[in-house]
């Protein structure tokens, strides 16, 4: 039981570190859906959204 808890905790911590770096924040100002072109130029993928007036891209 103790060993399985350690393995589960280790997997949880590793997955948090992997998925926590899944965003790229830019300093480009945006409104609405204008982040697609910004993200395509920054990271090569047109997947992003405008959060608090700044583009956040998702690779």
Swiss-Prot record:
Organism of this sequence: Androctonus amoreuxi (African fattail scorpion)
Residue numbers marked as site, Aromatic residue of the functional dyad: 58
Chain coiled-coil ranges: none
Signal peptide, first to last residue: 1-22
Lineage start: Eukaryota, Metazoa, Ecdysozoa, Arthropoda, Chelicerata
Main location: secreted
A GO term, aspect molecular function: toxin activity
Localization per Swiss-Prot or TrEMBL: Secreted
Free-text note on domains in this protein's UniProt record: Has the structural arrangement of an alpha-helix connected to a beta-sheet by disulfide bonds (CSalpha/beta).
Modified-residue entries (Pyrrolidone carboxylic acid), positions: 23
Protein purpose: Blocker of A-type voltage-gated potassium channels of cerebellar granular cells. May also inhibit Kv4/KCND when coexpressed with DPP6 or DPP10. The occlusion of the outer entry of the K(+) conducting pore is partially reversible and affects both open and closed channels. It shares the same target in rat brain than BmTX3 (AC Q8I0L5) and AmmTX3 (AC P60208).
Tissue: Expressed by the venom gland.
InterPro entries in alphabetical order: Scorpion_toxin-like_sf (IPR036574), Scorpion_toxinS_K_inh (IPR001947)
Entry keywords, A to Z: Disulfide bond, Ion channel impairing toxin, Neurotoxin, Potassium channel impairing toxin, Pyrrolidone carboxylic acid, Secreted, Signal, Toxin
Family label: Belongs to the short scorpion toxin superfamily. Potassium channel inhibitor family. Alpha-KTx 15 subfamily.
Disulfide bonds: 30-50, 35-55, 39-57
Name assigned to this protein: Potassium channel toxin alpha-KTx 15.7
Gene Ontology CC, one term: extracellular region
Site positions per UniProt: Basic residue of the functional dyad: 49
